[in-house]
Amino acid sequence: MLEKLFRPVAAIAITLGLCTSAFAAEPLKIGTTAAFAIPLEAAVEEAHKQGLEVKLIEFSDWIAPNVSLNSGDIDVNYFQHIPFLENAKAAAGFNLVPYAPGIINNVGLYSKKYKSFAELPEGASVAIANDPINSGRGLQLLAKAGVITLKPGVGYKATEDDIVANPKKLKILQVEAVQLVRAYDDADLVQGYPAYIRLANSFDATSALLFDGLENKEYVIQFVIRPQSKDDPRLAKFVDIYQHSPAVRAALNKAHGNLYQAGWEG
């Protein structure tokens, strides 16, 4: 009788063991972009020391990582925040979900000509990103700086139509996010991404008049997966290494300086 009662438990244990073995048999494949690659490389190296094999795949654009993940060519990607993910899902019908938080890259407002927002003249030009996700973040920054006022509650979905006050009559110019670094020389105020400013090595990434941060948690970069991968033990182990390894934290500090915050600590 006891033998019959315990058989289902044994069967479940064997099944779970087979599932775990199936996950562990292959290296974990992670897709990313250049801005996040170096700290991930440190995590891959640390994972190897702990017996977890990981393959890092670097993409040159922001579309392929989600296409590859959705098709199952990779197991997880790490390059996007929630607004970007939601926009991509709406546009392409991806079945993807956030798995765990990474870092938030502080985004700033930079000026080559002025040292404070008070110095901005009437009609000053302001360059922000032209895509729906990053332009909303730029407008939120301008509102935080006090140079414009937005309708209450619009958040990252803000557009220029949501500006209810613009006392300096700022001229907002929308340009491609990757071109914002170049706009620094011409515009009076520019939305800037420190990770890409550092890559371009064109001006001091720490020189922003204002940064955003964890008050906008929706911009924390996420480890993103397909829903069926949520119980993959390789994911849990790798994320734990990324979030808690001293070697990875040192790599993050070297790559981003003090221009990032740990999303899992906020």
Task: Specify the residue positions occupied by each region the protein language model found.
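A conserved helix-loop-strand patch within extracytoplasmic ligand-binding domains
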Residues: 99-149
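A bilobed periplasmic-binding-protein/Venus flytrap-type ligand-binding module shared by bacterial periplasmic
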Residues: 106-117, 219-234
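Pocket-flanking alpha-helical
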Residues: 62-94, 108, 115, 197-202
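Short, polar/charged alpha-helical segment
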Residues: 33-55, 64
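Ligand-binding "clamshell"
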Residues: 87-99, 112-114, 186, 191, ...
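Periplasmic-binding protein-like
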Residues: 134-143, 242-263
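Short, well-ordered beta-strand elements
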Residues: 25-35, 52-58, 125-126
